[in-house]
Each structure stands twice: as structure tokens, then as C-alpha cells.
Amino acid sequence: FGNWIEQGLTWIIEHFDEPLWNITIVILLGVGLFFTITTGLVQLRLFPASIREMWFGRAAEGNSLTPFQAFATGLASRVGVGNISGVATAIALGGEGAVFWMWITAFIGMSSAFAESTLAQVFKIQDKDGSFRGGPAYYITQGLKSRCLAVAFALSLIFTFGFAFNSVQANSIVEATKNAWNWQGEYVGLVLVVLTAAIIFGGVKRIATISSSVVPMMALFYLIMAVIILGMHIDMIPTVIANIYKSAFTFQSAAGGMFGALVSKAMMMGIKRGLFSNEAGMGSAPNAAAAAHVKHPVSQGLVQMLGVFVDTMIVCTCTAVIILLSDNYGSETLKSISLTQNALRYHVGEFGVHFLAFILLLFAYSSIIGNYAYAESNIRFIKNKPWFVWSFRLSVLFFVYFGSVKSGNVVWNFADTVMAVMAIINLVAIVLLSPIEIGRASCRERV
């Protein structure tokens, strides 16, 4: 059965991935620029306010989430394989310049993240137990009055986060643990299925509780190690940064498609992996943003905007510089997580390989939990029946195991294809609803 799924996914990837991404790049950057301009550079003007809101936001009432818990749930999905394995893949396939395009995607995308999470708060609904839920499927239905488009988005999110992204997370766990401890993928996959089942049958509130306590600790440990490594090579950092900028505008190797030489591999891989990592404008974080109880809708827009900054500008940059400071960058045999692990071996010895395997295991597992939370919200939007939710949970467990035993190329390409569909639908929706976000932002600044 797994082989049939793999063959079907391969056919879809071969026929739809390239044309979808040609469209996605234009819309992603265009919408980000639109909101950057119309909000008056919100990612710079209100950046200090986003930090205050995240730390001092209103406490939860009933079963709703605090702003910090919603931030951590969003970060649980953002901070993960994309920051470690995704960055390595981008550099291996697109060169140093891919890092620059990850930065651009994040900076422009911060305004899109602000807009989509503000909308999630405006159009959220309250359940009988007092908790809130919402996201693109809800603001498309209520704001654009289009149930069909909302269901299409919900399905794209379910396939992207519930299935594809969780396959990627599981695949990266297997690769990292195999490199470090020679663990077999089949057994790792079974353990992941059991651990995931134990959490996803416990409720979204438990997911938020785990995320808010574990994710910041993981990110802190990883950043401490990164700062130590950067300090050891501080004299080389200016050269690394200069090479990133220089390579970003080298168009010798085109990505292909209708843009031809206008889109380099650096740009294509930087944008793909940047979007995978920070999810800005994709329509995922609004599902966590809607669950928060805040005084003003814009407050959660600011919090989720901050998540994009932390994810890409800090965590992804640390990974990139660690790789580019090593002596194995450019090796044709090292890609994905193995490139990052070998870079750490160069800097701190075998400890780095084992440390990264452990950190990535926690990162990726927390991402699986966060991804599930997003997808479950959309499953309930389509059909809020116990048997439907349980069927979805079993499907999630299948794809966790699927990613554990299949090749990295298949699961990464699957993720690229479905997240392009999801991003296109959401970006079009938030532009059509832009008067609401812009109006709320203006109102928030007057109070």
C-alpha cells in the first residue's frame, strides 16, 4: 500500500510541482510587499509591541490559550526540521545565496503573517467548552462567503500539515538518528507512531501545554551551541555574510520554468525552504492565533509576526552560518540533515552529531504535534464528528510511519507541492480581505 502511495505522489510531483511554484513565488512576494506597504512597514514599526504582547498578553479564560501559548504552538510547528534540515537542503541545492532569499521571504512574509493572524482573531468562533478555534477556513467562509473555497483550503492544509509535513519531520528524525546512533527507520517509525498517538488523543490543550514548555527550551539549547560556534569563528563571519549576498544574485544556474534565468536555484530553494520553515502567509499559524484570548485582534497578529522573525532571522541563520563555516560545505554526498551534522562534527567533534540528533528529535516531534493541531482544527471545520476526527488521526499516524521508511526526496517534494496549493489559496484570500486587517491595525494604533 505504501508503494502505491509513493507512486501516486511521484506522478503528482512530476506534473504539478514546477508550475505551481512558478505561480507561488510571484504571489508570495507580491502579497508580502502589498502588506508591507499598506501597513506602513508593520514588521519594523510594531516590532517592539510584538515582544510586549507575547510576554504580557492577557491570560487565558476557560480553555482558550494565552498569547504566549499560541506563540509557542505556532513556534512548535515553525521551529523544527526546516531550521536544521531545510536550511541544509537549501544550501546544498541552491548555494549560499539561498540563505539571502530565506531572509527576504521572512522579512516580507512578516507582514503577511501579521495580516492572516489578525484575520484569524476577527473571524474565530467559540466552542461550548469556552475554547476558540479559527483560521483561513473560517475567515474565507465568513469574510468571503465561500464555503467551497474554505473547504478547498482546509483540505490543502490537512494534506500539507497532517500528512506531508509530518512525513518530512519523521523522515528527518530517522536520518538524524541513523547518522548518530545507527537506528533503523522501521523501528524509529513505530516508536514515533506510538508517541504521536499518545499526544494527539489527549486534546489540543495538552498540545499547547507541552509546546509552551518544551519548544523555548529546545531553541535555547540550540542557540547557545550556535553562539559558541560563531564565537569560535567570529573573524570569519563577515566573509560568510559577504558570500551569501554575492551568491544570492548569481544566476548562472537557473531553476527553470516560465521565468527561466530570472529565477536562480538560490532564489527558488531559499523561498521554498523559507516558506517551509517560517510558514508566513501559508495559512497555518492563524489556526493557533485564533485559539488565543486577546483584547484586540491585532495583538495576535503581532505575536505570530514575531514567530516568523525568531524562526528565520535567528534560528535558520545560526544553522546556515554553522554550515558555511565548516570544511565540508559543497560536498556532493552531504545533503539535508547529514550536512548539518557533519558541520557540527567539524566544529565540536562527535558530540555535535549526537547533540543535533537529540535536538532534532525533539524539534521534529514537537512539530508533528503542532502540525496535527493545525490540521485537526480544519478537520473539525469540514465535519465535526468523532468518527471523522478519529479517521484523520489514524491517517496522520500512517503518514508519520510513511515518512520514516521512504526516501527524503519523495517526502520533501510532496511537501513542496501541497504547501504551494495551500499558500496560493490563503494569500489570495487575505488580499481580498485586506481592508479588514488594515482597518484593525489603524484602530489598534489609535487606542
Segments from the language model and where they lie:
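Select transmembrane alpha-helical segments in multipass membrane proteins
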Residues: 25-31, 66-74, 146-160, 188-191, ...
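Membrane-interface loop-to-helix entry segments
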Residues: 27-31, 35-51, 171-177, 184, ...
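Transmembrane helix-loop junctions in multi-pass membrane proteins
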Residues: 38-43, 82-87, 96, 163-174, ...
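Extracellular/periplasmic helix-exit of transmembrane alpha-helices
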Residues: 114-124, 225-243, 251, 255-258, ...
